[in-house]
């Protein structure tokens, strides 16, 4: 296989001369011009372009290697000039060994050179070959200044600058000097107003003048002095100067609250012996009284025991502190009272029994008042019973 390449290289010219053969293969897809005379001299020296039979017989075992190029050789041979190319529409030059092809190719270049200047020249006119196609549709020449349109002419014609609105005299006056209210002398206000004569007024004075028709008073009205702090006032009856409320008698004289109420209720002047140095005030009870608050028991007062529940569990709670020896003795009594400090504290006299509840409460025996109080406080229902 490699001997065939060696033979072709030895029979042909220098490797540089054989290189156009590579260009010949790419001639259908390459725009490079290759002289046909040189290609004609190289083609006979390449055995694989002459067919499979042109190979030497001594290399028959290797002939099948060149069978595929030999079969495709006609497409690259003399008839390969008609092979189309996807890159350029024109076909390659036929391998003709004469000077006519060069002259024909040169004529083609000359024809392309006359259309080479496709961009429009500066003067705006087209060359002669395009006159018959472009002339009827477009004008003979483009405008000399393509960027001069109506907008540019309008901008160039407006030479005078745009007038800027000058600040008003009032704005300059506000910036140069501060205003002052002619009524109160204030220099700071959220809104400046004017009076009937054109003088500046602050917002407060302007609103007051607009609503009332008068100038706003500069001195604020003093608050009413409390009656207890009024200087120079004294009761016409008891001559006191301290009171919670000043009243007037029938003659119109100021009197203290105590003398005025006494005169109003009794119709006579209040006696001087009833005068007090301090002011007696009534202790008012709070409006919200906790009615469910239990009152603490006292040893000198009897605490009535009124059960609020008739369940059997409450009867068991009340009798848990009773002694078993005194329960039969208390069963025959119809009512019971709590013994005082001067009475006997014997177990018989301290027996406690609920009236009307003979079937439920058989008897409760407590030794002392302290035990009664302790027993009452331990039960959850006794707090409501004592309320």
UniProtKB/Swiss-Prot annotation:
A single Gene Ontology CC term: nucleus
Residue ranges, annotated region (Disordered): 54-82, 276-355
Keyword Repeat (UniProt): yes
An annotated GO BP: negative regulation of transcription by RNA polymerase II
Compositionally biased region (Low complexity): 299-316, 329-350
Keywords, in A-Z order: Activator, DNA-binding, Metal-binding, Nucleus, Repeat, Transcription, Transcription regulation, Zinc, Zinc-finger
GO molecular function: DNA-binding transcription factor activity, RNA polymerase II-specific; RNA polymerase II cis-regulatory region sequence-specific DNA binding; zinc ion binding
SUPFAM superfamilies, per database record: Glucocorticoid receptor-like (DNA-binding domain) (SSF57716)
Expressed in which tissues: More abundant in stomach, and in small intestine. Lower levels in lung, liver, ovary and heart.
Subcellular location(s) of the protein: Nucleus
Primary localization: nucleus
Basic residues compositional bias, start-end: 281-290
Zinc finger (GATA-type): 181-205, 235-259
Function: Transcriptional activator.
Identification of the protein by name: Transcription factor GATA-6
Organism per entry: Gallus gallus
Gene (name only): GATA6
């Amino acid at each position: 296989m490699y001997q065939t390449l060696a033979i072709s290289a030895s029979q042909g010219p220098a490797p540089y001369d054989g290189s156009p053969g590579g260009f010949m293969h790419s001639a259908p897809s390459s725009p490079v011009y290759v002289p046909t005379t040189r290609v004609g001299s190289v083609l006979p020296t390449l055995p694989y372009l002459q067919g499979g039979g042109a190979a030497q017989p001594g290399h028959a075992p290797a002939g099948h290697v060149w069978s595929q190029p030999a079969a495709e050789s006609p497409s690259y041979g003399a008839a390969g000039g008609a092979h189309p190319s996807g890159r350029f529409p024109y076909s390659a030059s036929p391998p003709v060994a004469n000077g006519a092809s060069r002259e024909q190719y040169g004529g083609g270049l000359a024809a392309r050179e006359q259309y080479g200047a496709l961009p429009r020249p500066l003067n705006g006119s087209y060359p002669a070959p395009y006159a018959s196609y472009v002339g009827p549709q477009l004008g003979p020449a483009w405008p000399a200044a393509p960027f001069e349109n109506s907008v540019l002419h309008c901008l160039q014609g407006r030479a005078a600058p745009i007038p800027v609105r000058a600040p008003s005299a009032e704005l300059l006056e506000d910036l140069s000097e501060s205003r002052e209210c002619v009524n109160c002398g204030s220099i700071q206000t959220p809104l400046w107003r004017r009076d009937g004569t054109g003088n500046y007024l602050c917002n407060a004075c302007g609103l007051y003048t607009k609503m009332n028709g008068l100038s706003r008073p500069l001195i604020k009205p003093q608050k009413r002095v409390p009656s207890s702090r009024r200087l120079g006032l004294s009761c016409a009856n008891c001559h006191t100067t301290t009171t919670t409320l000043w009243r007037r008698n029938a003659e119109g004289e100021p009197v203290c609250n105590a003398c005025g109420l006494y005169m109003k209720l009794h119709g006579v002047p209040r006696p001087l012996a009833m005068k007090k140095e301090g002011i007696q005030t009534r202790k008012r009870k709070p409006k919200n009284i906790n009615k469910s608050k239990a009152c603490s028991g006292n040893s000198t007062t009897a605490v009535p025991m009124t059960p609020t529940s008739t369940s059997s569990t409450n009867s068991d709670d009340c009798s848990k502190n009773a002694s078993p020896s005194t329960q039969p003795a208390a069963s025959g009594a119809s009512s019971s009272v709590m013994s005082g400090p001067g009475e006997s504290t014997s177990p018989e006299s301290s027996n406690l029994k609920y009236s009307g509840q003979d079937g439920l409460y058989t008897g409760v025996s407590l030794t002392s008042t302290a035990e009664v109080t302790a027993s009452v406080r331990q039960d959850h229902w006794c707090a409501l019973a004592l309320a």
